[in-house]
């Protein structure tokens, strides 16, 4: 009995520790703005077990941070295949989770993480100039969300920026009706989650509702948004546009919180709940400067908030599962004591307590949030400067993108990732 318990503890706990420990070095290298070395560090410990999806997601993100957009999408495609495979969790894994802990199950990704796969795959295609392929990812965002809603009885966590990006891609392809639908969906999700409506989305809704002759909807937006003038579709077609995305810091990390709860019959039970710890911000916002024109970024996506919202939404189900598991472990300890004496019962009870750890896995290379800006410019060559603004409101770093040449109706998308200094 003692040998069995020790082997069980080693098998369960060593697998959980190895992934998080290896990521500490990855995070340190990212904070030093060395994504290529971070990728090499990650690839030293490839995961093919319960953490295989996490490995693929982190690998894909580190590849795109290193400018390897094609390779990144190869990894994202592998992740999508695996997500589909894991969608129906096997009964064996469910049993393991019910008797040991949730970390024994293959990680299939939170709702917002699954949607983020398509967001970043689409951005990769845009970086490669493959707008048709980006459009396919936009369609897959909608399909993935439909499946998640069916699985969650309509309670899936939605990402407003995913809808916005879909609209942006459709608009680039001249599919204005579909773009309007996507922008409208994005607007409604921002409202539902009580988040500020980004200025760029307000402008898009006004521009397309007017272009599509949606008179009543246009009047509604005019009343809601304090915007005096918006470029028309025709005006944008005659200009170029600089689009900026800043992927700031890293998504929150999960920690384990010990709680004492009581069953319906008054039995005291120790459970471990996952809780999120936010990463520090690197900047407050940024300013895109093109000649005499400039625009300040706004936060359009917060994976920090989406992660917390996801945990809050699923908290009741998580607690119910944890209590059920704790009761099973208590019962196993009592049975061991009845059959093998007090020592056997104690060993099983200790094993139950030690293996009762929260599932603290998550996609760690996602950013904390995404800053976004759009700036229409005349066709031609422009020198582009990025000013990063710190918490005190001062410029803390300047990035020179150099000269960029645009044609009429062409969009140039610029991306940068900035990770705050590492703190353990």
Where are these regions (language model features)?
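Short loop/turn and low-complexity linker motifs enriched in small/turn-promoting residues
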Residues: 211-424
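Bacterial Sec signal peptide processing site at the extreme N-terminus
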Residues: 13-40, 44-46
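TPR-repeat structural position
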Residues: 35-36, 69, 131, 176-177
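Boundary/linker segments of alpha-helical solenoid repeat arrays
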Residues: 51-54, 83-94, 147-156, 187-219
